[in-house]
Amino acid sequence: MLVVGSELQSDAQQLSAEAPRHGELQYLRQVEHILRCGFKKEDRTGTGTLSVFGMQARYSLRDEFPLLTTKRVFWKGVLEELLWFIKGSTNAKELSSKGVRIWDANGSRDFLDSLGFSARQEGDLGPVYGFQWRHFGAEYKDMDSDYSGQGVDQLQKVIDTIKTNPDDRRIIMCAWNPKDLPLMALPPCHALCQFYVVNGELSCQLYQRSGDMGLGVPFNIASYALLTYMIAHITGLQPGDFVHTLGDAHIYLNHIEPLKIQLQREPRPFPKLKILRKVETIDDFKVEDFQIEGYNPHPTIKMEMAV
């Protein structure tokens, strides 16, 4: 049956009433569920996890930015990494030079050698996210090669389609390239995102095949929310929702106790994100264009990264 007018409004109000009073509670409930019901599984890193398959959360971007508050999230890292992706860079040292060392372990000499990439320079991650976003299908040589005009620029294609055909159901960017997987230091965890335009708002849904709930997921939520803000800004839209779909949602066994501490904390209001100048193209964004206002998180909780 077609739902129109007041019926549609009633449905929207019901959905709103069912949503938690604070978006962060969705994340905390996911963590609680995994701790309570997760299956114990071995994993690539040898650390061990509690895991469930299939979770989803919806974060409003309309008047707030979902930077979690029950612990401090590394905002500088979120911003610098996303700009690094947008550049198409696959050089971990480039990011590290800006004080963001989240890719250092995967680009280390020992790690690359363990994967059989002995001929590759240290820091060369292979055709990971940025390469797939901007040069999908091009032949990867090394992190220093110039790939201008090679492959499919998925990110620009997303932006162009939003501008010219916003009702298109194919506004998709995919980092999962089976041909290139053997060349990557780490295959994509956040594999595919789709954009959706309605009533002047831009929403994004991410499919994340693998979600490290302690360290990775808070970072990923903020990263794709930021990407949505950036694309909305360029295309003259307002940010709508970020829908986060998880495949294997897991908690590393050495993160259980830190996450129990986090669960005891009450979420504080999400901050706001301001873009400080008019930016015309996705490649023109700079670190200084963004300002987070009203971010008052609980203290940092230390968790070790599984490599």
From Swiss-Prot:
Its main location: nucleus. Pathway: Pyrimidine metabolism; dTTP biosynthesis. This is Thymidylate synthase. (6R)-5,10-methylene-5,6,7,8-tetrahydrofolate binds at D212, A306. There is a cross-link at K286, K302 (Glycyl lysine isopeptide (Lys-Gly) (interchain with G-Cter in SUMO2)). Homodimer. It comes from Mus musculus. The lineage of its organism: Eukaryota, Metazoa, Chordata, Craniata, Vertebrata. It is found in: Nucleus; Cytoplasm; Mitochondrion; Mitochondrion matrix. GO terms for cellular component: cytoplasm; mitochondrial inner membrane; mitochondrial matrix; mitochondrion; nucleus. It is an enzyme of class 2 (transferase). The modification Phosphoserine is found at S108.
